[in-house]
Amino acid sequence: MNTKQSRIRRARKTRAKIAAVKAIRLAIHRTNSHIYAQIISADGGTVMASASSNDKDLRGQLANGGTTAAAAAVGKRLAEKAKGLGIEKVAFDRAGFKFHGRVKALAEAAREGGLAF
């Protein structure tokens, strides 16, 4: 089993636990050059809000989309969008990635923006 398969296996376990409690989830995806975040409804069928380092408004502000500063900006932007929709509590789905670096920066910025998880 390689590292990608291990990450996907961890992600499946997390998603199953979140689905069992029927919580709105904040799902992230990380690539070498960008970071993406979505708030997904409890039934898993609707993306309620999204933000990424590849968005037009953030792309102009960021020198590089693959940094912790970019991840923090994405977390802050997503928290603002969630507050606008009246979403305050979510379950954090880190998609099997370690809670370190860019993933941690996004999570902390979202918490500072008012999301609880």
Swiss-Prot record:
Signal peptide per UniProt: none
This protein's UniProt keywords: Ribonucleoprotein, Ribosomal protein, RNA-binding, rRNA-binding
Domain of life: Bacteria
Gene Ontology annotations for the cellular component aspect, listed alphabetically: cytosolic large ribosomal subunit
UniProt GO molecular function: 5S rRNA binding; structural constituent of ribosome
One Pfam family matching this protein: Ribosomal_L18p
The keyword Ribosomal protein is annotated on this UniProt entry: yes
Quaternary organization: Part of the 50S ribosomal subunit; part of the 5S rRNA/L5/L18/L25 subcomplex. Contacts the 5S and 23S rRNAs.
Primary role: This is one of the proteins that bind and probably mediate the attachment of the 5S RNA into the large ribosomal subunit, where it forms part of the central protuberance.
Family: Belongs to the universal ribosomal protein uL18 family.
Protein name from the UniProt record: Large ribosomal subunit protein uL18
Source species of the chain: Thiobacillus denitrificans (strain ATCC 25259 / T1)
Upper taxonomic lineage: Bacteria, Pseudomonadati, Pseudomonadota, Betaproteobacteria, Nitrosomonadales
Gene: rplR
